[in-house]
């Protein structure tokens, strides 16, 4: 039995509130159960130095957690003067995931910066960030299209992410903190709306699992991402 009482293949409730802030071109508050992330997408009419003059755009991401997003208060990374390795890893993952479904040539010489700020953490913050980030990106791009700043849609597919793991010997979908903290194995799966794999991060803790175990987690991830894709489509009116 899972601590939450959910079935092995049952997601936490998903909520995506769009236009959560008034300034960003795209913004959402995304909730997976008690995990809540504020995501904004900001359009900048410039690109990184390595892309100047190449006629293509860029999508990048930043990630952070509010000090009391967790059970005990954590110090702000700005106060420490540097980002943790975990933060750098997650924001790179978010950026890679979004770039996998964007045609940079069609975006033109502009950059869209995604900011993911975790306001409450209960497991799956990076996957919630990716899933919410796609919606914020979609909203921002829609505004560019409406303003006739883009002639073609650069977003070629949707993307979502979910965690799966082995908890007390059973493969389960969408781990919360109580499960994630003691799971024998856990993984993050990033998939596109067409079913393609963008990234898989999987590891074991104190136990191992075989190839079939990994495939069972992937099958669960496909179930979960299917629900996320439906929530994303509803949020953006598609």
UniProtKB/Swiss-Prot annotation:
Belongs to the RNase PH family. Phosphorolytic 3'-5' exoribonuclease that plays an important role in tRNA 3'-end maturation. Removes nucleotide residues following the 3'-CCA terminus of tRNAs; can also add nucleotides to the ends of RNA molecules by using nucleoside diphosphates as substrates, but this may not be physiologically important. Probably plays a role in initiation of 16S rRNA degradation (leading to ribosome degradation) during starvation. One of its GO terms (molecular function) is 3'-5'-RNA exonuclease activity. Homohexameric ring arranged as a trimer of dimers. Its EC number is 2.7.7.56. It is an enzyme of class 2 (transferase). SUPFAM superfamilies: Ribonuclease PH domain 2-like, Ribosomal protein S5 domain 2-like. Keywords: Nucleotidyltransferase, RNA-binding, rRNA processing, Transferase, tRNA processing, tRNA-binding. The keyword Transmembrane helix does not apply. NCBIfam families: RNasePH. Pfam families: RNase_PH (PF01138), RNase_PH_C (PF03725). It catalyses: tRNA(n+1) + phosphate = tRNA(n) + a ribonucleoside 5'-diphosphate. Phosphate binds at residues 86, 124-126. This is Ribonuclease PH. It comes from the Bacteria. One of its GO terms (biological process) is rRNA processing. Signal peptide: none annotated. The keyword Nucleotidyltransferase applies.
């Amino acid at each position: 039995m899972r601590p939450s009482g959910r079935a092995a293949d049952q997601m936490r409730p998903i909520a995506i509130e769009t236009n959560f802030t008034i300034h960003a071109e795209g913004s959402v508050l995304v909730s997976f159960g008690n995990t809540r992330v504020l995501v904004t997408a900001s359009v900048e009419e410039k690109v990184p130095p390595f892309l100047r003059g190449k006629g293509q755009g860029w999508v990048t991401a930043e990630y952070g957690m509010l000090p009391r997003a967790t059970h005990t208060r954590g110090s702000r990374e700005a106060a420490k003067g540097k980002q943790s390795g975990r933060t750098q890893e997650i924001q790179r993952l978010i950026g890679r995931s979004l770039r996998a479904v964007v045609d940079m040539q069609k975006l033109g010489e502009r950059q869209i910066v995604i900011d993911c700020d975790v306001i409450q953490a209960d497991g799956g913050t990076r996957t919630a960030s990716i899933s919410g980030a796609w919606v914020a990106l979609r909203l921002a791009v829609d505004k560019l299209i409406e303003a006739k700043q883009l002639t073609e849609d650069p977003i070629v597919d949707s993307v979502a992410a979910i965690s799966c793991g082995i908890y007390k010997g059973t493969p389960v979908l969408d781990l919360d903190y109580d499960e994630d903290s003691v799971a024998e194995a856990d993984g993050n799966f990033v998939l596109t709306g067409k079913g393609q794999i963008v990234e898989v991060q999987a590891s074991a803790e104190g136990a191992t699992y075989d190839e079939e175990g990994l495939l069972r987690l992937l099958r669960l991830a496909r179930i979960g991402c299917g629900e996320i894709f439906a929530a994303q489509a509803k949020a953006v009116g598609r």
